Amino acid sequence: VTEAVYLIERMIDVLAQKIGVDKAEIRRRNFVRPEQFPYTTGFGWTLDSGNYHAALDKVLAAVDYEGLRREQAAKRADPACPTLMGIGLSTFTEIVGAGPTKVCDILGIGLFDSCEIRVHPTGGVIARLGTMTQGQGHATTYAQIIASELGLPASDIVVEEGDTDKSPYGAGTWGSRSTPVSGAATAVAARKIKAKAKKIAAHLLEVGEGDLEWEIDRFQVKGRPGAFKTMKELCLVSHTGNLPAGMEQGLNAVAYYDPPNLTFPFGAYLCVVDIDKRTGETAVRRFYALDDCGTRINPMIIEGQVHGGLTEAFA
């Protein structure tokens, strides 16, 4: 994706130079407009949402783009100026979350992913997935998804990956697909467990499921906040207690997730560099990175990935 974006962006820059239009303006003119979403591309992919104009405008305003252009023009007009000044601009839409089996199968193998969750009587959780972390923080991300769905502490959730003897089938870690696909499978599996726990809570509280509402870590009777069962209590009851007729013990679930579409995060990056005319030494003066990746499960991990990508580019 990086190489493809670089090629496209260089082509746009060359076009802007040839027709005498500012590089930011030519991009703005050719963006998909917000009111055009969902937008189907010439290749048949449907981009669900986006606001590319707002992203670009935010970046340009943050760095005072017009001021930078004036400074650049002044330096170019002054032969005695010891430095050259470059302004790099890149806007992109990334295709991630491969992918729908109907269009992304490899040798007949679909690119779905799966998650198996087992809940202990103590409220501890083991989640097994077919992906493998390479420094992206999978254990933290998957644990946070489960914690958010079930109201159990993330510190009590163990994530196991990469053991093909134990883990459910998955298409692996590549193409920025772990969270969109395996993460979604994790959420679906957790919701299956939550649905069963709700039935147990309704049985214990002697009310209908429709009379219950979820509040952080418990099911409580609507209008009666003192009548509730916590998820941790339900974990124990599911193994040892009085269950509804015909219900099996335990809180376990497996989910397979075949995404209906890819996901299309987008961004706008701007870099200002100064180059010493005599030595060729290059110094990055300013870098502004804007990404819209949708729901942020762990903002620190996202920021770390952006920092890592920028470091690679600098290197």
Protein language model regions, located:
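Cofactor-binding beta-sheet edge motifs in enzyme active sites
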Residues: 1-54, 61, 67-315
